[in-house]
């Protein structure tokens, strides 16, 4: 399920004044209008969200919440109601549900929709995202195999030395009671070993839940992020025993982790602190973090990490500032900031070291940017399906693979930014890793209220 939710701050509201003014003018000419400058709802908390994937020619389901019971609502785009002649009135819970027919010729992208309320008066704006329609093709280029694992899969990482796939999972919000680290045979996808992380002694019914994962083949370890504890941990590859659980609040909302094994370093993106945390993988000590500095005023929130070990560069993308960051690992500092025009909610990043290309996937705008690292220029803006979350570069086959989560697809892109395949890949793919031998491992994290449901890993092999 993909949710586009209204989130309007006072700082952003002035950007929408002209849109709101137009809506008010239209509304005053209708029965909806109460007159100019009637009593306004100064505590207005109404918001509207669209549910599911919306494409040209489809029908959108809209949900309103936080309105005053009995409040009348218009939803306007270019001065026209997007729900036709429907009269929207908030029920006793301050909510409503409505349908909107999306024209077949609607442009894909984010469309600002004005929320014009009356009785009492208020106005705001939400973005309605119309995603591209996608077709399945290129299936004959791949073999595909899937196997059930456990609930709540997040990421996987392959160990060339051990020839094993390590998969992490966590279910629900804190307190998290279900989380696992799995050792998987990459050929058969059979689970060979599994453990549940230790209980957190400071939080009732909560374990040190696992989210991000990377392997250290030099020291025989697995590094994981324990996001809910703002920390990281280290486990043995051999028996999955705990080597070290770092203290809480070591890495603010730790998201991804990557290991530069040859240089005894691990790097974790600190989503909540605008920095990349650094660790010595041999001594298991924390080192000074690398600060990320945006071109704008907001502090960046780094998401995915992509390591170019040969050139000693690390790349990350900030979900809130529309930027990618280049880190010089020799100097242990930020080297460059790359602006990402036409994107929102960037989350996935992958580097092609030899080609000096960077790929950035953005959930909010359904696109992947292909960037020339030598010039910093955007080579191509590639529209994919709804909600591209993560991306990985497969150097063997010279293809970037995108986990298009909301569409349940994986898209393969060549170095020209052309889609060479778009594959059905199970429900809600969350992450993709590669073994460097032409095998891609897709982990699925499908929302389900069924406690007996399990998510799966899919192996894609390039023929």
Regions found by a protein language model. Name each.
Residues 1-33:
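Gram-negative bacterial Sec-dependent N-terminal signal peptides
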Residues 34-463:
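Predominantly soluble domains enriched in secretory-pathway, periplasmic, or organellar proteins
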């Amino acid at each position: 399920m993909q949710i586009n939710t209204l989130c309007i701050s006072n700082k952003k509201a002035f950007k929408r004044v002209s849109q709101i003014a137009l809506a008010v003018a239209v509304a005053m000419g209708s029965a909806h209008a109460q007159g100019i400058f009637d009593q306004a709802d100064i505590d207005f908390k109404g918001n509207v969200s669209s549910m599911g994937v919306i494409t040209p020619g489809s029908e959108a389901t809209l949900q309103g919440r936080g309105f005053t019971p009995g409040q009348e609502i218009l939803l306007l785009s270019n001065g026209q109601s997007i729900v036709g002649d429907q009269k929207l009135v908030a029920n006793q819970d301050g909510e409503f549900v409505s349908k909107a027919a999306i024209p077949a010729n609607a442009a894909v992208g984010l469309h600002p929709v004005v929320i014009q309320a009356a009785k009492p008066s208020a106005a705001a704006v939400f973005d309605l995202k119309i995603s591209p329609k996608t077709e399945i093709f290129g299936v004959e280029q791949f073999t595909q195999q899937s196997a059930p694992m456990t609930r709540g899969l997040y990421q996987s990482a392959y160990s060339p030395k051990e020839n094993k796939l390590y998969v992490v999972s966590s279910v629900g919000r804190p307190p998290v009671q279900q989380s696992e680290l799995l050792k998987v045979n990459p050929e058969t996808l059979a689970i060979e070993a599994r453990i549940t992380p230790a209980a957190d002694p400071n939080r009732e019914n909560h374990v040190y839940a696992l989210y991000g994962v990377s392997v250290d083949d030099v020291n025989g370890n697995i590094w994981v992020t324990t996001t809910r504890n703002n920390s990281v941990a280290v486990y043995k590859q051999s028996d999955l025993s705990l080597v070290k659980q770092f203290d809480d609040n070591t890495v603010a909302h730790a998201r991804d982790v990557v290991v530069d094994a040859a240089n005894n370093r691990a790097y974790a993106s600190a989503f909540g602190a605008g920095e990349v945390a650094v660790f010595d993988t041999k001594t298991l000590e924390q080192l000074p973090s690398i600060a990320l500095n945006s071109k704008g005023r907001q502090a960046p929130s780094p998401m995915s990490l992509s390591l170019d070990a040969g050139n000693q560069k690390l790349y990350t993308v900030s979900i809130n500032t529309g930027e990618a960051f280049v880190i010089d690992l020799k100097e242990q500092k930020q080297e460059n900031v790359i602006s990402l025009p036409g994107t929102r909610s960037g989350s996935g990043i992958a580097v092609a070291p030899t080609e000096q290309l960077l790929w950035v996937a953005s959930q909010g705008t359904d696109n992947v940017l292909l960037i020339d690292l030598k010039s910093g220029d955007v080579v191509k803006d590639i529209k994919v399906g709804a909600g591209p979350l993560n991306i990985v570069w497969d150097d063997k086959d010279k293809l970037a693979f995108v986990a298009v989560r909301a569409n349940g697809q994986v898209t393969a892109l060549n170095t020209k930014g052309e889609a060479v395949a778009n594959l059905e890949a199970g429900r809600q793919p969350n992450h993709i890793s590669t073994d460097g031998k032409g095998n891609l491992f897709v982990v699925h994290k499908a929302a389900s209220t069924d406690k007996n449901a399990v998510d799966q890993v899919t192996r894609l092999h390039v023929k």
